[in-house]
Regions:
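Terminal amphipathic alpha-helical/low-complexity segments used for targeting or macromolecular assembly
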Residues: 1, 6-7, 37, 43, ...
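Structural signal for interior beta-strand "rungs" in well-ordered beta-sheet cores
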Residues: 2-166, 170
């Protein structure tokens, strides 16, 4: 049985998995679905109407939260603007206090969003990514897998997988510490370093360079190909390295 504080508000149509914990004054709106073991702390609001001026409140949409995710105080997760669809958060995520997820965000498994992170509508975040406190991410941006975003960053471009990013869309190298902790092989790391250099240090249009490198078939690890394939999609453009990093190769050395 899921312990639910008597002051929590859980609307009709909410679905709770086994062993969920709902703390005082949390609000779960109609269409919210929680997996097993989800913890929702005080004053969080899940499934509230999106902050979208043209939204029809009669739209039947929702929010889905994966098993084992922790949602701390005052987190807000808005429901989808589309009928039958949901804003999603994966399993084993940790959303710290005051995080905001706009409508139609898609957050994958094992993501950490630190205090006061703000994701605008339609942002996607890959698995094992960490976003530092106070960072803001523009609508429709894609954030790849295992990205490390520093606190107070302002992100308005797509962030490829496996990188570290700071300040205003500035890539500062590969997230090597995080990748090693995940057990990436030496070969995967070697190819990722080479792919990073090929895309960012060779000059020219990033999408064109990545597409050309992929077509050449020089990279064989799943990780390197995933990095390159990221640049073949998206509409917002891509974050680039700091000049200092580009000049010195910071973040991609052995």
């Amino acid at each position: 049985m899921s312990p639910i504080h008597p002051t929590a508000i859980i609307e009709e149509g909410v679905e709770l998995g086994c062993d969920c914990t709902i703390h005082a004054h949390a609000v779960l709106r109609r269409g919210t679905v929680l997996g097993d073991g989800v913890k929702v702390h005080e004053f969080a609001v899940l499934g509230g109407d999106p902050q979208y001026l043209k939204f029809d409140p009669a739209t039947r949409s929702g929010v889905r939260i994966g098993a084992g995710t922790v949602i701390r105080e005052h987190v807000t997760i808005n429901r989808s603007i589309h009928s039958g669809e949901a804003t999603t958060v994966g399993a084993r995520c940790f959303l710290m206090a005051n995080v905001h997820l706009g409508h139609d965000c898609a957050v994958a498994d094992d993501v950490v969003l630190a205090n006061n992170v703000m994701l605008a509508g339609h942002v996607s975040v890959g698995s094992f990514t960490f976003v530092g406190g106070g960072a803001g991410i523009h609508q429709f941006c894609r954030v790849g897998e295992s990205v490390m975003v520093s606190g107070l960053s302002r992100i308005a471009l797509d962030l490829p997988p496996f990188v570290m990013v700071a300040e205003r869309n500035e890539v500062i190298g590969l997230n090597l510490v995080g990748l090693k902790r995940r057990g990436f092989s030496r070969e995967a790391l070697r190819e990722l370093k080479a792919a990073f250099r090929a895309v960012y240090f060779s000059g020219g249009n990033i999408r064109t360079v990545a597409t050309s490198v992929l077509a050449a078939g020089e990279f064989h690890t799943t990780e390197a190909r995933q990095f390159l394939e990221f640049f073949t999609a998206g509409k917002r453009g891509f974050a680039r390295p700091r000049r200092a990093a580009a000049d010195s190769g910071e973040g991609v050395s052995d």
